[in-house]
């Protein structure tokens, strides 16, 4: 191996062994357990975030942690926001998935600090409830029934979640909700409706489709990014 190749190899190895990164040279991104997929370049993901999302939206985020966490295993999820920080599983499919996970959890952080700005005028709430009503109509027309009261609940409800993903099934739900929600996960609760929309806003190349499908949500997120 020549000297140039050796230097490049050593630099790449050092990057892979690095356990501390920063977003906007300010927010620590700490690696508790190395990302299992060696093809994922965390620096690329963080750079993309810095290029696409306004820095001020991260002002209330304390840190990002990547690794194996009991909280993730208990909920059977890849990411979670809690106590001012984002926790991510080190088992990531690819850079796109990691990017979206960080954005999604950032949205939950924003909910915590801008709840009145996001939900105060109830426009998103009204839009979400109307979509839930459309969902009920479609599912019942396909002979899929549950307690009607569940469609009106804004918070996450385990019974409704089990109905959607076990009784209806994710694949079928995705097919039936194409013209209602940006993704099936957005139907689970108001908070996920917002976070899923925020994720799409900064990763989807079809803003016109988003704006047409969820106009109130699109406008709210757009306004939030301009504060």
Task: List the predicted regions and their residue ranges.
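Low-complexity, serine/threonine/proline-enriched polar segments
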Residues: 124-172
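Auxiliary, metal-adjacent structural segments of Zn-dependent hydrolase domains
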Residues: 16-99, 120, 140-148
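A conserved beta-strand element that flanks and buttresses the S-adenosyl-L-methionine
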Residues: 102
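Non-catalytic architectural context of zinc metalloproteases
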Residues: 1-36, 62-70, 99, 165-178, ...
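Catalytic Zn2+-binding segment of zinc metalloproteases
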Residues: 105-125
């Amino acid at each position: 191996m020549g000297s140039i190749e050796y230097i490049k190899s050593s630099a790449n190895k050092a990057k892979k062994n690095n356990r501390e990164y920063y977003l906007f040279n300010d927010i620590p991104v700490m690696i508790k357990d190395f990302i299992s997929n060696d093809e994922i370049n965390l620096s690329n993901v963080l750079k993309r975030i810095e290029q696409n999302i306004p820095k001020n939206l991260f002002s209330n985020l304390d840190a990002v942690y990547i690794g194996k966490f009991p909280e993730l295993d208990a909920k059977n999820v890849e990411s979670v926001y809690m106590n001012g920080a984002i926790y991510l599983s080190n088992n990531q499919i690819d850079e796109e998935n990691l990017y979206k996970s960080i954005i999604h959890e950032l949205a939950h952080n924003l909910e915590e600090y801008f709840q009145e700005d996001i939900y105060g005028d109830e426009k998103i709430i009204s839009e979400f409830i109307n979509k839930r009503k459309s969902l009920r109509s479609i599912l019942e027309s396909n002979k899929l029934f549950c307690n009607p009261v569940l469609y009106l609940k804004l918070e996450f409800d385990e019974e409704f979640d089990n109905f959607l993903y076990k009784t209806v099934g994710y694949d079928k739900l995705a097919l039936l909700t194409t013209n209602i929600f940006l993704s099936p996960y957005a139907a689970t609760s108001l908070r996920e409706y917002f976070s899923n929309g925020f994720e799409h806003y900064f990763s989807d190349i079809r803003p016109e489709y988003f704006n047409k499908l969820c106009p109130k949500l699109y406008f709210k997120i757009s306004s939030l990014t301009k504060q």
